[in-house]
């Protein structure tokens, strides 16, 4: 019987119990370390799980109970939320960022979370093969990130990429988001909502490899072989590398989990198998390395998706072991969604770039690119203000645009083909933005700025989904090409399912679907556009973006990780760049602001840095505020007078850019 796909049986198997144990023992990350443990489930759900566990000899209920604490978050929302989508690093913005974290390149640049991967990509691809381009480099960069920071991305997941070339017809958007298995249906998590987060049922069909291969075939330089892009990463996994701060801290957080699941996760354990490897230790991933070498020799990704190949068979066996429903047909039938990027003009004749049309390219498909464009269209009705960051009027405009953007996101969902569905066309219609602009102007008469008194006035259509996790990188090359790519396995270590034969860590992307008959605490129904269906991709908050100058040259390449904070972080980065005329270093380092409409409050990364005067002004406008642990990570590259200024979000994830 497939667990959670129907009524939960009275006797749970061992692996499911261990996964429930895993979910309940992870903690909220405070000041970079798990200083207090908080359950991720409601008290009702916990009681149901405890009742099930009482009949098991595998785990004493009392051991689990000591980890359970009352959820004291005051957001008024669903208590089944969690904070297991971000690494446990100390994260803090900066008003005085170190200038050495701004990297300046004459030929090209890579902005990502991992300097080791950016250096490897530049040396082994862009410099080793002079004719290679950003699309080629993106393959190596993505695979390297999944190899090293395997807690938040990898070939067991999926994502989105936007490519821009010299000509308009070169621009491309690829949706390689995971797909729901063909046996999926909207009732599948009705009896066990936690099963969308952990175990085999949480796994969507991985798409990262197919997406990277399609990018390579469609927009690669043709001057480098597929094998040349894969081998450097395979060799890294074979030889190994020194564990950095982010991976070390995340492994430490999950130590009890991996000791419990040591049979499948032995590669993260020390030589005596009584603990995980630590920061500074040497780690190898031989299984993944061997599998990548097989793909390199094959010259394609065919073995990964071939139902008769040992790679695909091993993956399916592993997912089935943990009660998953993904089968060989799901894997063999997976395809990506290739379209032109969504695009629009901004800042025509704006104060600081006279007579200049900036073209914004962003992702289509199941991403939130359409919502980002809707917010930019709203913001484009308001004037620039140099130095306007956290000024009264500009901040009001930005916050209200964020709230309307959340309303737009509630209408989004996966679709196929080039034509946009009516519910997505609606939010891209200038009339929709005009409605928001009129509301903003009506409530800011004579300098008296007021947010709308009730969130319902922003007209969200459905519950606003809250995705998690993610990793992003931006690349520009010496030929004028750019890549903005965001990829994820969703929560930390995805579904916690690892195939020790192939080295694949599987996503838990099924958690990003809406759950049928489960309205949120604000009585908003789940989105009809985002229910689990066979072959469907769940809605993502991802919005990898490239901004082109009037000459068609990449001017800003940007994207973010951080779940629902992705779109607001990308929006604020673009607004700071083109509305406030801020340098890219300060744009990324400074504290960020976030509003997703529900819960109806502003989230601020640092009250002290923003200051009492600004906080008082926001309160007068009618906003409720909460200081939060920084959760979004932005990696971007800016064209400054022909030079590439690359900045990674060191302040939130220790990223350092690389240039050449």
Curated annotation (Swiss-Prot):
Gene: ECM38
Disordered as annotated region, ranges: 73-92
Effect recorded for residue 494 to D: In strain: YPH499; lack of gamma-glutamyl transferase activity
Comp. bias regions, Basic and acidic residues: 78-90
Glycosylation positions in this chain: 119, 191, 270, 298, 454, 517
Recorded topology in the membrane: Single-pass type II membrane protein
InterPro entries for the chain: GGT_CS, GGT_lsub_C, GGT_peptidase, GGT_ssub, Ntn_hydrolases_N
NCBIfam families with a match to the protein in the record: g_glut_trans
Entry keywords, A to Z: Acyltransferase, Glycoprotein, Hydrolase, Membrane, Protease, Signal-anchor, Transferase, Transmembrane, Transmembrane helix, Vacuole
Name of the protein this chain belongs to: Glutathione hydrolase proenzyme
Annotated active site: 470 (nucleophile)
Sequence intervals crossing the membrane: 14-34
Source organism, top-level taxon: Eukaryota
Pfam families in the cross-refs: G_glu_transpept
Subunit description: Heterodimer composed of a light and a heavy chain. The active site is located in the light chain.
Modes of activity regulation: Activity is decreased by glutathione and ammonium ion.
Intervals, Cytoplasmic compartment: 1-13
Lineage: Eukaryota, Fungi, Dikarya, Ascomycota, Saccharomycotina
Intervals, Lumenal compartment: 35-660
Catalytic activity: an N-terminal (5-L-glutamyl)-[peptide] + an alpha-amino acid = 5-L-glutamyl amino acid + an N-terminal L-alpha-aminoacyl-[peptide]; glutathione + H2O = L-cysteinylglycine + L-glutamate; an S-substituted glutathione + H2O = an S-substituted L-cysteinylglycine + L-glutamate
Functional pathway: Sulfur metabolism; glutathione metabolism
Post-translational modification: Cleaved by autocatalysis into a large and a small subunit.
SUPFAM superfamilies for the chain: N-terminal nucleophile aminohydrolases (Ntn hydrolases) (SSF56235)
Misc. comment: Present with 672 molecules/cell in log phase SD medium.
Gene Ontology MF, one: leukotriene C4 gamma-glutamyl transferase activity
PROSITE patterns assigned to the protein according to its UniProt record, in alphabetical order: G_GLU_TRANSPEPTIDASE
EC number, UniProt record: 3.4.19.13, 2.3.2.2
Induction of expression: Induced upon nitrogen starvation. Repressed by ammonium ions. 6-diazo-5-oxo-L-norleucine and L-azaserine are irreversible inhibitors whereas serine-borate is a reversible inhibitor.
């Amino acid at each position: 019987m497939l667990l959670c796909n129907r009524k939960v049986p009275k006797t749970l198997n061992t692996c499911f119990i261990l996964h429930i144990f895993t979910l309940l023992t992870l903690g909220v990350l405070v000041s970079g370390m798990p200083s207090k443990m908080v359950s991720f489930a409601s008290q009702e759900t916990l009681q149901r799980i405890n009742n099930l566990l009482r009949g098991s000899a595998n785990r004493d209920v009392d051991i689990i109970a000591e980890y359970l604490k009352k959820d004291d978050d005051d957001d008024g929302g669903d208590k089944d939320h969690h904070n297991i989508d971000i690494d446990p690093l100390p994260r803090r913005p900066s008003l005085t960022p170190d200038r050495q974290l701004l990297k300046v390149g004459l030929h090209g640049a890579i902005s990502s979370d991992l300097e080791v991967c950016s250096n490897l990509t530049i040396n082994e691809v862009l410099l080793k093969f002079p004719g290679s381009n950003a699309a080629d480099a993106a393959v190596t960069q993505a695979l390297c990130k999944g190899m090293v920071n395997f807690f938040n991305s990898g070939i067991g997941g999926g994502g989105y990429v936007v490519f821009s070339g010299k000509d308009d017809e070169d621009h491309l958007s690829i949706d390689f988001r995971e797909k729901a298995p063909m046996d999926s249906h909207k009732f599948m998590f009705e009896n066990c909502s936690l099963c969308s987060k952990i175990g085999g049922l949480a796994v969507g069909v991985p798409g990262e490899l197919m997406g990277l291969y399609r990018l390579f075939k469609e927009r690669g330089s043709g001057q480098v072989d597929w094998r040349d892009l894969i081998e450097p990463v395979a060799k890294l996994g074979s030889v190994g590398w020194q564990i950095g701060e982010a991976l070390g801290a995340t492994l430490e957080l999950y130590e009890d989990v991996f000791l419990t699941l040591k049979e499948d996760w032995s590669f993260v354990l020390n030589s005596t198998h009584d603990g995980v490897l630590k920061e500074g230790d040497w780690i190898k991933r031989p299984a993944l390395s061997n599998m990548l070498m097989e793909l390199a020799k094959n010259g394609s990704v065919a073995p990964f998706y071939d139902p008769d190949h040992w790679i695909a068979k091993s993956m399916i066996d592993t997912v089935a072991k943990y009660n998953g429903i993904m089968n060989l047909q799901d894997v063999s039938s997976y395809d990506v969604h290739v379209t032109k990027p969504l695009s629009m003009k901004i800042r025509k004749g704006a104060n600081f770039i006279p007579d200049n049309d900036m073209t914004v390219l962003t992702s289509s498909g199941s991403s939130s690119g359409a919502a980002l464009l809707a917010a930019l269209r709203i913001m484009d009705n308001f004037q620039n203000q140099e130095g306007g960051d956290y000024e009264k009027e500009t901040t009001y405009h930005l916050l209200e645009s964020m709230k309307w953007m959340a309303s737009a996101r509630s209408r989004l969902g996966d679709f196929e083909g080039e034509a946009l569905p009516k519910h997505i066309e609606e939010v891209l219609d200038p009339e929709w933005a005009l409605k928001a602009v009129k509301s903003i102007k009506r409530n800011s008469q004579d300098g008296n700025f007021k947010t709308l008194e009730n969130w319902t006035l922003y007209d969200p259509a459905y519950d606003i989904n809250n995705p998690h996790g993610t990793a992003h990188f931006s690349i520009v090359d010496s030929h004028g090409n750019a890549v903005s790519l965001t990829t994820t396995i969703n929560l930390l270590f995805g579904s916690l399912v690892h195939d020790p034969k192939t080295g694949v860590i599987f996503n838990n992307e099924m958690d990003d679907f809406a759950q049928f008959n489960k309205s949120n605490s604000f009585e908003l129904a789940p989105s009809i556009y985002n229910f689990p269906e066979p072959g469907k991709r769940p809605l993502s908050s991802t919005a990898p973006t490239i901004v082109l100058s009037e000459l068609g040259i990449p001017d800003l390449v940007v994207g973010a990780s951080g779940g629902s904070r992705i779109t607001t972080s990308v929006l604020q980065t673009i607004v700071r760049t083109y509305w406030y005329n801020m340098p890219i270093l300060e744009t990324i380092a400074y504290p960020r602001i976030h509003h997703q409409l529900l819960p109806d409050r502003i989230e601020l990364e640092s009250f002290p840095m923003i200051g009492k005067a600004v906080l008082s002004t926001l309160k007068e406008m009618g906003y409720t505020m909460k200081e939060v642990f920084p959760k979004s990570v932005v990696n971007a590259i800016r064209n400054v007078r022909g030079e590439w200024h690359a900045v990674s979000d060191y302040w939130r994830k220790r990223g350092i850019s690389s240039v050449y």
